[in-house]
Amino acid sequence: MKTSVLFVIFGLALLFCLSFADELEDTGRQCGEFMWKCGAGKPTCCSGYDCSPTWKWCVLKSPGRR
């Protein structure tokens, strides 16, 4: 029982560390990639992507989109 509790605690700590490292990497980018939040106060979308006015995230450019 004690071992399983320790595994759960260490697993949650590892998950927290990995998600923090991923978030730290994402905030270091200068532009947003696919499905990245965009809009006021957020980085602009990278080349090849547009900010969707409906969903407020970066989507692939399409020929019909302005």
UniProtKB/Swiss-Prot annotation:
Probable ion channel inhibitor. Belongs to the neurotoxin 10 (Hwtx-1) family. 29 (Jztx-13) subfamily. Expressed by the venom gland. GO terms for molecular function: ion channel inhibitor activity; toxin activity. InterPro entries: Huwentoxin-1, Huwentoxin_CS1. SUPFAM superfamilies: omega toxin-like. One of its GO terms (cellular component) is extracellular region. It is found in: Secreted. The presence of a 'disulfide through disulfide knot' structurally defines this protein as a knottin. Disulfide bonds join C31-C46, C38-C51, C45-C58. It comes from Chilobrachys guangxiensis. It comes from the Eukaryota. This is U10-theraphotoxin-Cg1a 3. Residues 1-21 form the signal peptide. Residues 22-29 form a propeptide.
